[in-house]
Amino acid sequence: MSNTTLKMSQQEIIYELKYAWSRQKSVSIRFLQNSQETTSQGKIFGIDYDLLYIKEENLVRRIALDDILSINI
């Protein structure tokens, strides 16, 4: 088995982000950070051009939209 990471299409990611943000639902986002796969959980705080802001308890994390691999609501 190869060591490849499956990625949602950009269109699917944007649709899921907008849905979760409009309804203030908690999300789990899988993304690349320094070439490592990372998971973040929280509520979407905002979207600005090519960045996503997600609030995790008392921390706001900034994630580039191009680095997002998948999102689960």
Indicate where each model-derived feature is located.
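Short glycine-rich, low-complexity segments
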Residues: M1-T39, E57, R62, L69-I73
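Short beta-strand-initiation
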Residues: E37-S40, I47-Y49
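Short, conserved beta-turn/loop elements at beta-strand boundaries and strand-helix junctions
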Residues: I47-L52, I73
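Generic alpha-helical hydrophobic packing signal
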Residues: L52-Y53, R62-A64
